[in-house]
Amino acid sequence: DCEVVSLLRSSGALVMGKTVTTEFAYFDAGKTTNPHDHTRTPGGSSSGSAAAVASFMAPVAIGSQTNGSVIRPASYCGVIGYKPTYGLISRHGVMKQSNILDHVGVFSRSIEDLAFVTKEIIKKDPQDKSTVSYSVSDIMNIVKSKPAFDPQFVFFKTTKWKNLDKESAKSFEAFIKKLGSNVTVIDAPSTFDKIFEYHQIIHESDMAYTFSHFYQRRKAKLGKKLVEAIERGNKYNARDYAEACESRDHFYEQFQEVFHDYHAILTPASTGVAPKGLEYTGSPEFSTVWTYLGMPSI
């Protein structure tokens, strides 16, 4: 068992099984369909986890996110998906893609169930040096209580907004309007788009290293998308990688300034409804920034 599963078992959880993921948690899809419409994708990479919760096979499920692999499937399947702050949940024993970008997340149908499970797995783990100590002992009381203050939100309308389908854009704008004075619309800094490039460099470079033995020995059996990502990752140099990693701290500090005046950032979870067919699991672009920065998403 990986550390997360061990913690759940020791807390009395009944582990029902292993859900389907995309190949090595990348873009080559499995056979899982969307429980609301079997002609559509459930998203990826945590396809089976989102579908299992949405179809009432399980009240909660575990997934992982290196780009948009928890938030996007949750959106497509109509359940709650939570990707915590980097370092809150151990990745020990989980199939690795990128030590810098990998997060373990949780799916559920209610905030109460989400909190109930999360409090058991947010723990510092000496086997995963990225983890930190953080107390969540009072989380059940917090989720059941009303906010102690009037929350203020910020919405960044980035260049990615143009990729949102018309109906989703219309619905999200109506949602923003409904919040009224509780939300402020701000243009993202011009350097915002650079984050997507940096994330790709780290992601693909790390995959090229992590999966090198599979690529060298079993390339013919690997999916096309994974092979292409590994080959792109092998072309980046040390300077590219160092810049992408160092810039992460710079951008993180920039975003922390936002929270001097606002409590949360609002953004779409996906580019729209789940795409037709199973080959394409959808775009992760509305999660990329928060995964790169290690910021929590729900």
Task: List the predicted regions and their residue ranges.
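Gly/Ser-rich catalytic/binding loops embedded in alpha/beta enzyme cores
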Residues: 1-67
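Glycine-rich, small-residue loops and helix-cap segments
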Residues: 9-18, 58-59, 213, 236-298
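A short helix-breaking turn/cap at a secondary-structure junction
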Residues: 83-169
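Glycine/threonine-rich beta-strand-loop-alpha-helix active-site module
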Residues: 66-92
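Short helix-loop capping/hinge segments that flank enzyme active sites or metal/cofactor-binding pockets
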Residues: 147-152, 156, 198-256
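Short glycine-rich, flexible loops that bind phosphorylated cofactors or substrates
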Residues: 23, 162, 273-275
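Acyltransferase
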Residues: 2, 164-189, 212-217, 241, ...
